[in-house]
């Protein structure tokens, strides 16, 4: 029985509703969120994460973030999924990624995401989804 994955499911459910506080209830005050694959500095602390999420929410019309596979090891959750969303300007963006969440008392305190930023940039600029990305994200959702 999974112990950590239900926490991630709670985060995803909150973000589907763009419920920033619903996301933050699952992280520690000292969260370190590396959400740019090393392109930008880590977001450090719950207040900074709140500001980042509040900055994202107004530009996203809807999102379909989902996880295809995961594995747990002690207090780590490894995940593979897609961050798929539609911007209010009309662009459709789908970013396949892998990530790791580290937990302390069932709260996320380290969050690392790994993805190809070129996919994100090109789709945000209006490029269509490639067949390869479509194949990568057309998988069943993990239960």
Model region roles, listed by residue range:
Residues 15, 35-39, 121-124:
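Proteins with a high burden of low-complexity, intrinsically disordered sequence enriched in S/T/G/P/A and R
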Residues 1, 38-42, 90:
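Alpha-helix initiation/capping motif
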Residues 11-14, 34, 85:
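Alpha-helix C-capping/helix-to-loop hinge sites
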Residues 3, 51-143:
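A beta-strand edge to alpha-helix "cap/lid" segment located at domain peripheries
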Residues 2-26:
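Short acidic-aromatic low-complexity motifs
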Residues 21-75:
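A solvent-exposed, acidic/Ser-Thr-rich amphipathic alpha-helical stretch
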């Amino acid at each position: 029985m999974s112990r950590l994955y239900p926490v991630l499911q709670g985060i995803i459910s909150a973000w589907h509703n763009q419920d920033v506080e619903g996301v933050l209830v699952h992280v520690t005050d000292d969260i370190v969120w590396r959400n740019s694959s090393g392109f930008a500095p880590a977001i450090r602390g719950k207040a900074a994460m709140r500001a980042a999420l509040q900055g994202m929410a107004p530009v996203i019309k809807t999102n379909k973030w989902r996880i295809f596979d995961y594995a747990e090891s002690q207090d780590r959750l490894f995940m593979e999924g897609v961050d798929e969303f539609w911007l209010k300007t009309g662009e459709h963006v789908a970013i396949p990624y892998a990530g790791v969440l580290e937990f302390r008392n069932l709260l996320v305190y380290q969050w690392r995401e790994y993805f190809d930023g070129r996919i994100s940039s090109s789709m945000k600029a209006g490029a269509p989804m490639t067949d390869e990305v479509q194949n990568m994200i057309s998988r069943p959702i993990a239960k």
